[in-house]
Amino acid sequence: MKPEEIERMRDEALAAFAAADSLDALQEAKVAHTGGASPLALANREIGALPPQAKAEAGKRVGMARGAVNKALAARQEELEAERDARVLVEEAVDVTLPHDRVPAGARHPLTTLSERIEDIFVAMGYEVAEGPEAEAEWFNFDALNIGPDHPARGEADTFFVQGPEGGAESGVVLRTHTSPVQIRSALTRELPVYVICPGRVYRTDELDATHTPVFHQVELLAVDEGLTMADLKGTLDHMVQSLFGAEMKTRLRPNFFPFTEPSAEMDMLCYVCKGASVGNPDRPCRTCSSEGWIELGGCGMVNPRVLTACGIDPEKYSGFAFGFGIERMLMFRHNVEDMRDMVEGDVRFTRPFGMEI
């Protein structure tokens, strides 16, 4: 093994590394000149066949050549990696002066916003917001409200009943059909006088269509104090409607029957579109109120003495009034929403126009 042959192998390897212009090309050169089948590797294996006096000299020369090759390989790899990193930094550079992509602003659901708007109106009047469980005992949902066992509302055609243990038929629990149970809980647990507003989800066995949904939202109000009359109820209703629809709005009460109030009434408000001008005027029909001039909002009345007694309140000393209405219905009035399904399907095209305020 001649010294010039070892030098030639070394020089060929160094030249191949220097000529590599990428890490992939360098890898190919590495395999060719430092791998198990490379010339220097083969020369190293041939040393064992040399005469004893030539082994030391040949081994020294091959070792020095391989050391130079490995050093050159490491240096060239470091250079190519530095070039690659510099190129990536340039190619992936971010121009921080460019305008960023605008993220679409979200919007709260209008039902939530309207519910909180109504709460704010009554909180400003001194009422407290009260909440209760949605899976409610039948006593709170029916019995305490003077709704007897034979009342139609207690049938499966109107109410979701919760199964008993191990699939038993009766559990004494229903999905509340109104937020009135929160009124009962408030009257039982709070010191008199009681002034609470009770918003929340309620459940009825209705099919989802343009005007009905099995899950909807109510706001109910309860006031219990000494000397309250229907005049106080009427003034409270007027203030709520005027706060929501404008100072020119009016309300009226029509006699009705509810088991939990006596006397009871349906609450109507002046049509906010035609202001009553469509009544008897075929030239100016109003779709909102069907040219009747008034829109029904909900039920109200003075709390039935039996309900007060069920809550441990002396009906001879205290009186109270209550009312309730659906928030979905109120939203349909305020914004001419024609299909209740739009409120529950989660389509952002419905919520986006409302933004943060309504």
UniProtKB/Swiss-Prot annotation:
GO terms for cellular component: cytoplasm. It comes from the Bacteria. It catalyses: tRNA(Phe) + L-phenylalanine + ATP = L-phenylalanyl-tRNA(Phe) + AMP + diphosphate + H(+). Keywords: Aminoacyl-tRNA synthetase, ATP-binding, Cytoplasm, Ligase, Magnesium, Metal-binding, Nucleotide-binding, Protein biosynthesis. It is found in: Cytoplasm. Mg(2+) binds at residue 262. Its EC number is 6.1.1.20. Binds 2 magnesium ions per tetramer. Its cofactor is Mg(2+). Pfam families: Phe_tRNA-synt_N, tRNA-synt_2d. Signal peptide: none annotated. GO terms for biological process: phenylalanyl-tRNA aminoacylation. The keyword Lyase does not apply. One of its GO terms (molecular function) is tRNA binding. NCBIfam families: pheS (TIGR00468). Tetramer of two alpha and two beta subunits. Belongs to the class-II aminoacyl-tRNA synthetase family. Phe-tRNA synthetase alpha subunit type 1 subfamily. This is Phenylalanine--tRNA ligase alpha subunit.
